[in-house]
């Protein structure tokens, strides 16, 4: 990966974080990047899931943070982690693909395509994001389980999948277009900016300092991308909250939401501040965990 200091064997004493940022792509087929991505995702979901539920309510209904928290309190602690299985399955799988495929595809493209490095890395990031979208059904079911309007229709992941089955396979992939756009955009920016951001952080001379830098760099980048992609996720959430019926286009749903929220940008970004903090924590955890595990695998 572009800035991964863990891709090279280190001497016992670390001298600088900036010396570890040079591009270094490993051989195709190494599973450590997939495994580290999977473990990083598990760690993140377990910690941040309650925050994600509050954010989901705000995206879906355009309500304030306090009202979303009150909704969750009324639902009770028993339902706080309701629906965690789909995001756990989805995130562990997609982040494994995100990191692993990016490494493999970058290696293949560099070997077989004569193009600038930034171009091959960009293409690898987009292709990895496209592959992640295969698991859209898990994100789809997660959306349904988090929506309290569907609490009386199904109580677990299996029932939610079963409820969609009668509508055909296309129903599992409702909201695919915004997911593809979000994945491609965020992957290109994440892998492209991770190295430069770390270069501008204070020089790290110990493993713990590297861990802090990885958390800060990943967190800042994740927060920025979370804010940038927030309107896309608002539309995606609205699309995936529907069961059956017409498959509406992205522009049509966006226009409908825009009108519902009084054509005000601030209303469209309602919940974005919480998303910013969640993304800051989530991607800090993901990036730091990923880089930490690479040192030991």
From Swiss-Prot:
Solcar repeats lie at residues 28-108, 116-200, 209-296. It is found in: Mitochondrion inner membrane. GO terms for molecular function: NAD transmembrane transporter activity. Belongs to the mitochondrial carrier (TC 2.A.29) family. This is Mitochondrial nicotinamide adenine dinucleotide transporter SLC25A52. The chain crosses the membrane at residues 34-51, 85-105, 118-138, 179-199, 215-235, 268-289. Pfam families: Mito_carr (PF00153). The keyword Transmembrane helix applies. Disulfide bonds: none annotated. It catalyses: NAD(+)(in) = NAD(+)(out). One of its GO terms (biological process) is mitochondrial NAD transmembrane transport. The lineage of its organism: Eukaryota, Metazoa, Chordata, Craniata, Vertebrata. Keywords: Membrane, Mitochondrion, Mitochondrion inner membrane, Repeat, Transmembrane, Transmembrane helix, Transport. It is a multi-pass membrane protein. GO terms for cellular component: mitochondrial inner membrane; mitochondrion. Mitochondrial membrane carrier protein that mediates the import of NAD(+) into mitochondria. Compared to SLC25A51, SLC25A52-mediated transport is not essential for the import of NAD(+) in mitochondria. The transport mechanism, uniport or antiport, its electrogenicity and substrate selectivity, remain to be elucidated.
